Amino acid sequence: ELPKPLRSAKEADLVGEPCPPNLLRWLATLPARVIEILDRLAEQGHGAWLVGGCVRDAWFGDEVGDIDICSTCPPEEMLNLFGNDAIPTGVEFGTVTIKGDGEHFEVTTLRTESQYRDGRHPEQVEWGTSLQEDLSRRDFTINSMAVDVARGLLYDPFEGKADMEANIIRAVGNAQLRCEEDSLRILRAYRFLERGTGQLWRMDPALKEAIQLHSKRLDMVAIERRWNEVKKILMKSGAGKILHTMMEDGVLKYIFPHCQFISPKIFDAMDRDAVKELTVPQRLSLLLVEYKPKVVFEAMKFLKTSKTTMKDTCRFHEQLRHLPQPMAGELRVFRHCLGQDAAPHLMLRKVLSTIGVTIHGMPQMNVEDIDKITAMWDTLQPSRAPSQCLVDGHWMMSRSGVGQGIRLGRLKEWLHRIQIEKDIDDRLMLERELSLLPFNHGDHEHWPKLQFP
């Protein structure tokens, strides 16, 4: 049963079918605010339906994210109807966001649209009253289903339910037109190919043909939007399989024009269980591991990633080119410098050695050498030494006799490295180490630093 009684809204111009049990269970958990929105629209004589991704995810029994509503109510009337709770987020496209209970719900007026001249947005939008027509302009059959909550009816004019049962991604109607209308649908098709199992769905041949024919239209889509879709693909369980398919279909070059060929071995590596916990920067570093650091930087710049993603990707990619020695002190410095990247770094180096992939410009490491390092790493105890240096500049000057300046700073860094290497957590022990250092002689530029590599 619904959380509260709901009056029936205007009927759809479609024949519906009773919602299956999995959808009915979801409807019974709908937020009260959603019911209130539907009820108010029905009170004014409008039709209102839950639509798109929320219906798809609920059918699978997945956690439902955004709940989207479509309605015959024009946006201007919606703004008046919901007053201060209404936000005109996309009125020109019929979308109004309704606030309530700390959440936001998008309500979009049914639309009829003309040509998409820029490959992304319709040239002209007119409000409609036909749910059939509205669903017919959506991207894929699995996203073109709607639910009448009050009547408990599912509207599925393009057989999205059958395609979900058969694990097929199919365009609504003419696949060529769908790709021409909105070129971002090309990337969305690949994103929907996998649903957490690691196995890919089949792409309908007509959709695949349309994507291959129109992939060049991706250049019409803002790179930020392309990157947003690819970022989601990168984090999927079957990311390697999806990206490999994109490369074979001639699509990946519109995402990574600087890195148009990637070894199939790397795609296979991306789908290993050990790799599935990696972050986006770590996955990007693996994907582009055969390219030089400068090329990776240009790739991140082209994608207009966030500064953090660019910095983390370039840093991890560069660090992957190096390995610590299989000695406790070296590994402690490695752990200190890389932090949470340390364990993924060693894991990836072992994976790359196992599959025979060479990092650009670096000699091939055999698995046995990596095993020596990982064996020592596995026996490494948690650090006792604090991450910050135990002593400050005043302490250094009083113990060493070295005055303020670059030489003192370099000496402190050298001592800090020793603190980490030897896992020292006591100032007296550190003072003993200082007394053994030949800091009164030699060029300070050659003193060890606390860094990796």
Where do the PLM segments sit?
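Catalytic cores of the polymerase beta-like nucleotidyltransferase superfamily
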Residues: 1-453
